[in-house]
Amino acid sequence: MSKVIGIDLGTTNSCVAVYERGESKVIPNKEGKNTTPSVVAFTDKGEVLVGDSAKRQAVTNPEKTIYSIKRIMGLMINEDAAKEAKNRLPYHITERNGACAIEIAGKIYTPQEISAKVLMKLKEDAEAFLGESVVDAVITVPAYFNDAQRKATKEAGTIAGLNVLRIINEPTSAALAYGLDKKDSEKIVVYDLGGGTFDVTVLETGDNVVEVLATGGNAFLGGDDFDNKLIDFLANEFKDETGIDLKNDVMALQRLKEAAENAKKELSSANETEINLPFITADASGPKHLVKKLTRAKFEGMIDSLVAETITKINEVVSDAGLKKDEIKEIVMVGGSTRVPLVQEEVKKAFNKDLNKSVNPDEVVAIGAAIQGAVIKGDVKDVLLLDVTPLSLGIETLGGVMTKIIEKGTTIPTKKEQVFSTAEDNQSAVTINVLQGEREFSRDNKSLGNFNLEGIPPAPRGMPQIEVTFDIDANGILTVSAKDKATGKAQEIKITGSSGLSEEEINNMVKDAELHKEEDKKRKEAVDARNAADSLAHQVEKSLSELGEKVAAADKENIQKALDDLRETLKNQNASKEEIESKMKALSEVSHKLAENMYKKDEPNTANDKKKKDDDVIDAEVE
């Protein structure tokens, strides 16, 4: 069995790790960095850029640069979080089968396809580092991700050509990395605040067991929201001063986003920073510049309500675990946004305890995922990971009520059955509406999908017995079945529609990704050939210039023709590697002939020079 990689597919950055020779370690990308920006860009030339190269050109290409795609993963277009994302993000969010999608240059991409491009880069970087093909992976998700979001993440892995062995919760993964070597049992809290999501999880670790006691969070709260508070502040101040709304200018908005992100990072170590954006926009009076000094205190005032929300969630989750705060031994901080001083201060204050910063917040989740991969593969023995479902699952019953079948906090994998009946006399079919959430009424919870059980024999209401079974696998993904106990007729639904993609669509996307992989390879080869051709043409032109009149007219004409042919081919942006190399070969051949001719011309002169020098030598006799 080949190596299993662990992937932290983050909102802002992603990380990949592998377990080998008894330890889990982060795999650097081809740029030499341990994390890769979760950014994908489409250029006007048809190139697809991923990671640092995509992030670098975001300001000049805002509408075709996709970031924070995780925030709309598995979302339906009519959900509030989707509406918020449409208002915030510069690229065009549309829908496909009712689920969120992205439109770029007239083509629709799902969040799964965009995320797959990030995963493909991580896969390729891992293969380059390990020197072997990689297929199997463990991918992490926020603990509070619902079924649709988990399913969409797994689909992204499939599209990227990965065999996703397990979907694992990020805080659980971090605890696995942190607690694997702990012999004594201890209760810990993992506070995970990333770019777009927040989770807090209470776990018990020790003696190679990692057990989740309770988990909670917000799948739409993270460092992006800190940035957005600062973006709003800067845009509003600028509008008050100039009357210009920068939010209507996608390029200005992208510059604001970069400036806000940098200011946030600087204020983690400095008490004041200056945001300086020259030529941010212009009006009839001329160009406008944005220059603003910002103190840490001012920034903390903007985000204090968001941080307070995370502290409230801490209290809820510790209570759900049946514990008091003084029973918590360690608070492990995970996610890049935990570097914000206010976050650290408030979490420390909440527990009245120093925080554990021994783990790298950007890397620990991937490291834990790699350990889980090694457990599945059998390289790590006797490790037991007991995770839980973050939200209750049930069905809609009479009166629009949600009847829970699996309560939140239930250890997974799990399987539970419950018997229901008909609501009307002679009812021949029942509709099973599968729900996820904690509210009393079905309309206030998320519908994951529905299906019909038909062919129920006529009977008074309340008589037929319909057995509904909920089965959650180790990935937290749900299968629901219903069976009429009298006839044995059954119907099953694997909750797939909630992610917006059918199995056929996923298979098509896998093929499409493979096709584009080959296209990208050819495009890269053409770029390399183009660079080599430019270099050759420059060298030949330089040689012609230096040799001047020494070059015979016929040779010069042949070389110039080959040069012109090559230059003409290079003007065609779609020229293939083979076309370019053919013209390069022709130029190389005539250039070599020139070199041979020049060498032959020089040979007699060299011999005469040598003879002349010999004639000038006076023989000396030595006694």
From Swiss-Prot:
UniProt region (Disordered), positions on chain: 595-623
Chain positions with Phosphothreonine modification: T197
One GO biological process term: response to heat
Top-level taxon of the source organism: Bacteria
Signal sequence interval, chain numbering: none
Gene3D superfamilies xrefs: 1.20.1270.10, 3.30.420.40, Actin, Chain A, domain 4, Substrate Binding Domain Of DNAk, Chain A, domain 1
Intrachain S-S bonds: none
Bias (Basic and acidic residues): 595-615
InterPro entries (alphabetical): ATPase_NBD, Chaperone_DnaK, Heat_shock_70_CS, HSP70_C_sf, HSP70_peptide-bd_sf, Hsp_70_fam
UniProt entry keywords in alphabetical sequence: ATP-binding, Chaperone, Nucleotide-binding, Phosphoprotein, Stress response
Molecular function per GO: ATP binding; ATP-dependent protein folding chaperone; unfolded protein binding
Presence of keyword Phosphoprotein: yes
Induction notes from the record: By stress conditions e.g. heat shock.
Protein family according to the UniProt entry: Belongs to the heat shock protein 70 family.
Purpose: Acts as a chaperone.
Identification of the protein by name: Chaperone protein DnaK
Organism annotation: Campylobacter jejuni (strain RM1221)
Gene that encodes it: dnaK
